Amino acid sequence: MEVTDVRLRRVNTEGRMRAIASITLDHEFVVHDIRVIDGNNGLFVAMPSKRTPDGEFRDIAHPINSGTRSKIQDAVLTEYHRLGELEEVEFEEAGAS
């Protein structure tokens, strides 16, 4: 299984969420609402989840092994950092320093 596309939208919120992503797996299956979170130990990817009636969050979809989780996290965070670099270049080109 390969992550064949990542669509990412940065968000400006008061909390720790930095972006929301959608990934495509093997050009055949899309997972929406993956969140990039700024945690205590750096950025990490949180899979889509739903709040249960007792207030807990349960994943709607998630990888079942660490190798797949790493592939997803690496692809999403690579795109997150790439977009950050593009925004910095656009900011500099606009004349701000």
From Swiss-Prot:
InterPro entries: SpoVG (IPR007170), SpoVG_sf (IPR036751). The gene is spoVG. It comes from Bacillus cereus (strain ATCC 14579 / DSM 31 / CCUG 7414 / JCM 2152 / NBRC 15305 / NCIMB 9373 / NCTC 2599 / NRRL B-3711). This is Putative septation protein SpoVG. Belongs to the SpoVG family. SUPFAM superfamilies: SpoVG-like. Disulfide bonds: none annotated. Gene3D superfamilies: Stage V sporulation protein G. The keyword Cell division applies. Keywords: Cell cycle, Cell division, Septation, Sporulation.
